Structures are given as structure tokens and as C-alpha cells.
Amino acid sequence: FPGFTEDWEQRKFKEFSKKTGKKNTKDLDFPAYSVSNKAGLISQTEQFDGSRLDDLEKTNYKFVEPNEFAYNPARVNVGSIAFNNLGMTVIVSSLYVVVKMSEDLDNEFILQFIKSPTFIKEVKRNTEGSVREYLFYENFANIKFPFTRNKEEQQKIGAFFKQLDDTIALHQRKLDLLKETKKGFLQKMFV
């Protein structure tokens, strides 16, 4: 970005992250969430069409605190990784990996990186398994990413790409609405 002159280097996530996700052993009543490859963190009630989850055994679930990342190690290769920007603690399946990034990293910058084709390529290089491939934390920690010490530059880059994502989403909604309108007109016209 213009105005920034600090060097960039390739660093590994293990230098800036730690595995978190304590288990909900006391069966505390936190909302249960899943990680979607499209919507990020999504309420399990919403994901499963309003099904009642009150009787769900939640003692094996893991906490995801605000500003932590969670991912499905068997589906991260298709984008099942999310950032908790909900402003509240939630719980996720015990199968998920929960990660806290260092204060040296801007979370939006990292979120944009983990949506990138470069990250997905690195995921594929670092997975384990023959039938179903998994990205365990130890493998995630070895993935390299572009790093600058200038957090302000990280923030500007993250905000730039977030704004692009928001604009794309807005236009996608408009496109979907136009398609539905066209479909309605066609149905009325050719009845």
C-alpha cells in the first residue's frame, strides 16, 4: 500500500498463534455454532432449520471466544474456517480446531488471507490422511503467510478486501433479486 515502506516476509502461523478451545466440561449453556464454508460461524439452530438442540450433549463442545478462529480440520480445504466476530462466546463441535492469533496480527487481514487461493493451496500441501484429509493444528501452524510488522498496513489491507467482499455480497443479492423477478415475469407471461 502507498505510504508504507516496511519489508514483508514469509512467516509461519506457529510464531503468531496458539491452539485454544477448552472443552465445555461443566455443560454451560452457550449457543452451539458450526463453521460453514460460505457463512462462517452459523448457529446450529439456523443451520439445521430451527431444529431444537436443547437436549444436545454439549460437554464435549469447545469454547470459541470472541476474536478466535475455528475450523473443521476435515473441511478447511473448502473454506470451513471462521472468525468469531459475534461479540460473544459460542461453542463448537469437539472435532473443530480453535486458534487464537497474536496481537501482532490484524484478524481481518488474517481472515482475508485464509480465504485466499494461496492459503487453500498451502492447506492441501499440509493435510494428512488417505481417504479423508485433515489439517491438524500442528500442520496449520507450519503454514506460511505474508507478514509485515506494521499492523496499520495489515489493517488497511484487511479493510480493503473486506470492503470488496461486502460490495460483492451486495451485488450478489441484487443479482439474485433480479433473477427472481425475471423468473416471476416469465411465469406470468407464459402461463
Annotate each predicted stretch with a short phrase.
Residues 90-95, 128-153:
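A short glycine-rich beta-alpha junction/loop motif
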Residues 1-25:
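Non-catalytic DNA-recognition/assembly elements of restriction-modification systems
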Residues 155-167, 171-172:
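Extracellular/lumenal glycan-associated surfaces
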Residues 48, 53-119:
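A short beta-sheet element
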Residues 1-6, 10, 173-191:
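Short amphipathic coiled-coil heptad-repeat segments
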Residues 21-54:
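DNA target-recognition patches
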